Amino acid sequence: MRRTPAAERLSELGFPPRRGSQEPPFPLGVTRGWGGWPIEKRCEGPRPVPFSERSAEDGREQPAHGSGILWRVRTRLSLCRDPEPPPPPPPLCLLRVSLLCALRAGGRGSRWSEDSARLLLLPPAGASGSLKAERSSSTPYAGRMLESSGCKALKEGVLEKRSDGLLQLWKKKCCILTEEGLLLIPPKQVQHQQQQQQQQQPGQGTAEPSQPSGPAVTSLEPPAKLKELHFSNMKTVDCVERKGKYMYFTVVMAEGKEIDFRCPQDQGWNAEITLQMVQYKNRQAILAVKSTRQKQQHLVQQQPPQTQQIQPQPQQPQIQPQPQPQIQPQPQPQPQPQPQPQQQPQPQQLHSYPHPHPHLYPHPHPHAHSHPHPHPHPHPHQLQHAHQPLHSQPQGHRLLRSTSNSA
């Protein structure tokens, strides 16, 4: 079977004959696409005649064009079909045909074919712009996680932490400063969480409104490598140095552990961490003082009923000694028939005793209960009996003299 030359096939397709070293404007012999769809060709020169309006001799009678014409071919599918409509093609056929034609139309080293193939594989410009807008508008993963737990992110950024290994390399950490501490998250983990969010967002838009609650809860799961430096365990922020474009500082924990950080000088992470730590300590001290005061007030409110029960107890012994002076005045008439001893206290007043005053006036003395007579009158009589052994001899002579005189 003899193969028809390329010039005849080009004339059948409606293109002028080839002259010189000009490349064919379109792959030879391609008249129909995948599934029997007719393919039309366009060029910058005269428009080719459709198949329905073309005769067998039209290709030979067409005028020739100059060799300087540059052909730019683009494939497209016609809107009308043949009288015998073929079955509908699968969805991937359009991409296959357009990609094949774009790669073969411009020749082996054509830049246009590469660009067209690249454009076919890339998403449309509107989709990429919408993704960028979603990324800029959407809050980061860690910030949304903190908001769900009730904390507020005061500052977010990247800090470099010195590793604990032998090499002590600087590793970047995504840091979030809150009112209660500093959160450290590996940057790879944050990127992974953001990718999961972007994958879940288009699924949520097509799903029913009742279904997105499930992925939203799962996306807020805490990361596995999250490290928190709480202000309650933090002691100081020390060793602040500026070298080059970095600022170096050390966070000293309560257990004695030291963690080295560095950041650009214009960010001022050390000042922010110190300020929030001092404010946290002040809040805790105020809460401690308030709690102690509330405990004291609570104890004071419970004490008054107990004091009322204790007060009636000392009143009872005060009532008991009162009937004693009422019963004991009976022996008072006994010293009355002795008039002589009552006249003799005058010479006894000449003697100076070290403590005569406590017995002259009645007052609640601690040894008042030891005396059987709390009344003020029997005190002179008691003084006589108390000092009788000291002056027994002169009193005895006086008594004898008085008896002799009376006799």
Swiss-Prot record:
One of its GO terms (molecular function) is phosphatidylinositol phosphate binding. Keywords: Apoptosis, Cytoplasm, Cytoplasmic vesicle, Nucleus, Repeat. Residues 354-381 are annotated as: 11 X 2 AA repeats of P-H. Residues 189-204, 297-319, 385-395 have a biased composition (Low complexity). One of its GO terms (cellular component) is cytoplasmic vesicle. It is found in: Cytoplasm; Cytoplasmic vesicle; Nucleus, Nucleolus. This is Pleckstrin homology-like domain family A member 1. The lineage of its organism: Eukaryota, Metazoa, Chordata, Craniata, Vertebrata. The gene is Phlda1.
